[in-house]
C-alpha cells in the first residue's frame, strides 16, 4: 500500500486486529522509506440490490433514505439512536441475505414496518399510515388492531 506521507509504494504491516464488531480488520503499517506509521481498515465490499420502485423504475439503494424513513416515523419518540442504528443494520443485512440483484420498494417497506413494530408501536402506525396511504380513520384502527394483536 502506498504511504500517505511520502508516496512510497512499499509498506509493511506491523499489526493486524479484527474490529469489535468483526466486520473489519484494523492494520498498523510502517513505510519502508520514511519509517512513518499509519492505520488502515479493511472491510468487505458489498453491493446492495437495486430498488425497484412502484412505477417500475430502478434506483440505487440509499442508506440515507432508509434511515430517514426510520427517523421520520420515530420523530419525538423515546427510542435511542443506537437501537435505530441496529434496526437499519438488520434491514440492510436482510436485503443482503436475499442475494438478489433487485428488490422491490414494497419489500423494503415491509422490513421497515417489521422493525418499527419491535421498536415502537406509535412509530409503526405513523409509518404504516404513509406507506400504505391510509385514507380514513378506519385504516388507522385496523393498523392499531394489527399491531396490538401481534403483541398478544
From Swiss-Prot:
<keyword id="KW-0067">ATP-binding</keyword>
<feature type="domain" description="ATP-cone">
    <location>
        <begin position="49"/>
        <end position="139"/>
    </location>
</feature>
<feature type="zinc finger region">
    <location>
        <begin position="3"/>
        <end position="34"/>
    </location>
</feature>
<keyword id="KW-0238">DNA-binding</keyword>
<keyword id="KW-0805">Transcription regulation</keyword>
<comment type="function">
    <text>Negatively regulates transcription of bacterial ribonucleotide reductase nrd genes and operons by binding to NrdR-boxes.</text>
</comment>
<dbReference type="Pfam" id="PF03477">
    <property type="entry name" value="ATP-cone"/>
</dbReference>
<dbReference type="GO" id="GO:0008270">
    <property type="term" value="F:zinc ion binding"/>
</dbReference>
<dbReference type="GO" id="GO:0005524">
    <property type="term" value="F:ATP binding"/>
</dbReference>
<keyword id="KW-0862">Zinc</keyword>
<dbReference type="InterPro" id="IPR005144">
    <property type="entry name" value="ATP-cone_dom"/>
</dbReference>
<dbReference type="GO" id="GO:0045892">
    <property type="term" value="P:negative regulation of DNA-templated transcription"/>
</dbReference>
<keyword id="KW-0479">Metal-binding</keyword>
<protein>
    <recommendedName>
        <fullName>Transcriptional repressor NrdR</fullName>
    </recommendedName>
</protein>
<dbReference type="InterPro" id="IPR003796">
    <property type="entry name" value="RNR_NrdR-like"/>
</dbReference>
<keyword id="KW-0678">Repressor</keyword>
<keyword id="KW-0863">Zinc-finger</keyword>
<keyword id="KW-0804">Transcription</keyword>
<dbReference type="InterPro" id="IPR055173">
    <property type="entry name" value="NrdR-like_N"/>
</dbReference>
<dbReference type="GO" id="GO:0003677">
    <property type="term" value="F:DNA binding"/>
</dbReference>
<dbReference type="Pfam" id="PF22811">
    <property type="entry name" value="Zn_ribbon_NrdR"/>
</dbReference>
<comment type="similarity">
    <text>Belongs to the NrdR family.</text>
</comment>
<keyword id="KW-0547">Nucleotide-binding</keyword>
Amino acid at each position: 500500500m502506498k504511504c500517505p506521507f511520502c508516496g512510497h509504494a512499499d509498506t509493511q504491516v506491523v499489526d493486524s486486529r479484527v474490529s469489535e464488531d468483526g466486520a473489519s480488520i484494523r492494520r498498523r503499517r510502517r513505510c519502508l522509506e520514511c519509517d512513518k506509521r499509519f492505520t488502515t481498515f479493511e472491510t468487505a465490499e458489498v453491493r446492495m440490490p437495486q430498488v425497484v420502485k412502484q412505477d417500475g423504475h430502478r434506483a440505487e439503494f440509499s442508506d440515507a433514505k432508509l434511515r430517514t424513513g426510520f427517523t421520520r416515523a420515530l420523530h419525538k419518540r423515546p427510542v435511542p439512536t443506537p437501537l435505530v442504528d441496529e434496526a437499519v443494520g438488520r434491514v440492510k443485512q436482510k436485503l443482503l441475505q436475499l442475494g438478489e440483484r433487485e428488490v422491490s420498494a414494497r419489500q423494503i417497506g415491509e422490513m421497515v414496518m417489521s422493525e418499527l413494530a419491535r421498536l415502537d408501536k406509535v412509530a409503526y402506525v405513523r409509518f404504516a399510515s404513509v406507506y400504505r396511504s391510509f385514507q380514513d380513520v378506519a385504516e388507522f384502527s385496523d393498523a392499531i388492531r394489527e399491531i396490538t394483536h401481534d403483541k398478544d
